[in-house]
Amino acid sequence: MLLAIDVGNTNTVLGVFEGRRLLDHWRVETSTRRTSDEYGILVRQLFTHRGIDPMKVTAVVVSSVVPPLQSNLEKMSERYFRVRPMFIGPGVKTGMPILYDNPREVGADRIVNAVSAYERHHAGVLVVDFGTATTFDAVSPKGEYLGGCICPGINISMEALFQNASKLPRVEFARPPHVIGRNTVHSMQAGLVYGYVGMVDGICARMQAELGFPVKVVATGGLASLVASESKAIHQVDEFLTLEGLRIIYGRNHAS
């Protein structure tokens, strides 16, 4: 079995594969204060809770945008699963040319998403990932990573409103009953939801015009479904895009 770990700034998503089949997945808080033993015990408890034997894990692959966690995840993998993890980064075969001024600058999660989306569609794609940052990544019909946009994430924007406007409360990112809010909470929700929908549709339209070829727009991330339900640009939501990309890239580096 393959344990795939996607470490984001806010959350860490784990998935366990048996061959091409995703057996289960979990989302936990990303914490640089958690030790390697704490991570190991947590992951083994998640496995046990779902009736999965952790001793059947034969490989671990990690995509991380939090460098301080690399050492702990490496120790966790070696101690609790007895395997050396593969980290997505320079030197790893992705099968995708990266046409970026400095390819080393591109976040591992963005490349993993691009590989996963292209593998599924084999056409021009735009990937919109609603994480701590909201990212847009373009892939050519030839499977080349072209670049993209990085915007403040939804939760960052909500927290900024709360922190910097003393009379505004924290609100849930949820669809309000009307675009024209009739109270403060609904007004903030309208601005956040429809503001992000407008941003997504606007950036996708501009990127498609610049690319000059048709693209499939694929969204992923915890808040993707809500935005996609109001968006005119998003064609598909793929909750497991990053985990599948990790599986694909691991396979390309360990072909039997």
Curated annotation (Swiss-Prot):
Its EC number is 2.7.1.33. Its main location: cytoplasm. Its cofactor is NH4(+); K(+). SUPFAM superfamilies: Actin-like ATPase domain (SSF53067). It comes from Myxococcus xanthus (strain DK1622). Catalyzes the phosphorylation of pantothenate (Pan), the first step in CoA biosynthesis. The keyword Magnesium does not apply. Substrate binds at residues 100, 107-110, 184. ATP binds at residues 6-13, 132. This is Type III pantothenate kinase. It catalyses: (R)-pantothenate + ATP = (R)-4'-phosphopantothenate + ADP + H(+). Pathway: Cofactor biosynthesis; coenzyme A biosynthesis; CoA from (R)-pantothenate: step 1/5. GO terms for cellular component: cytoplasm. Keywords: ATP-binding, Coenzyme A biosynthesis, Cytoplasm, Kinase, Metal-binding, Nucleotide-binding, Potassium, Transferase. Pfam families: Pan_kinase (PF03309). HAMAP family: Pantothen_kinase_3 (MF_01274). It is found in: Cytoplasm. Coiled coil: none annotated. A monovalent cation. Ammonium or potassium. GO terms for biological process: coenzyme A biosynthetic process. K(+) binds at residue 129. Belongs to the type III pantothenate kinase family. The active site is at residue 109. CDD domains: ASKHA_NBD_PanK-III.
